[in-house]
């Protein structure tokens, strides 16, 4: 499941408990990420799911749900 994989990657990258991560969680407001964290997260997700997220798309991503929906729309899963 995409959400589970995304959640694990976010927890690992940000050093937080995966149980804190919800679909509606904001990277900055809820999970305490900064802009560098988000760039590193996008890179890790691109590698894990073998996708490429253009910068203009990455700038629109603000929540976990945004990332999950983008990945689902751009993968075969």
UniProtKB/Swiss-Prot annotation:
Post-translational modification: 4'-phosphopantetheine is transferred from CoA to a specific serine of apo-ACP by AcpS. This modification is essential for activity because fatty acids are bound in thioester linkage to the sulfhydryl of the prosthetic group.
Key words, A-Z: Cytoplasm, Fatty acid biosynthesis, Fatty acid metabolism, Lipid biosynthesis, Lipid metabolism, Phosphopantetheine, Phosphoprotein
GO BP terms: lipid A biosynthetic process
GO function terms (MF aspect): acyl binding; acyl carrier activity
O-(pantetheine 4'-phosphoryl)serine: modified positions: 35
Domain Carrier: start-end pairs: 1-75
Pathway entry: Lipid metabolism; fatty acid biosynthesis
Pfam families reported for this sequence: PP-binding
GO (cellular component) term, any one: membrane
Subcellular location: Cytoplasm
Gene3D superfamilies in UniProt: ACP-like
Function: Carrier of the growing fatty acid chain in fatty acid biosynthesis.
Protein name: Acyl carrier protein
Record organism: Clostridium acetobutylicum (strain ATCC 824 / DSM 792 / JCM 1419 / IAM 19013 / LMG 5710 / NBRC 13948 / NRRL B-527 / VKM B-1787 / 2291 / W)
Gene symbol of the encoding locus: acpP
């Amino acid at each position: 499941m995409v959400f589970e994989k995304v959640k694990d990657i976010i927890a690992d990258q940000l050093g937080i408990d995966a149980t804190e991560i919800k679909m509606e969680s904001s990277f900055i407001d809820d999970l305490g990420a900064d802009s560098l964290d988000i760039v590193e997260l996008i890179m890790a997700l691109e590698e894990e799911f073998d996708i490429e997220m253009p910068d203009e798309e990455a700038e629109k991503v603000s929540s976990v749900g945004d990332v999950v929906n983008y990945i689902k729309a751009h993968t075969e899963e």
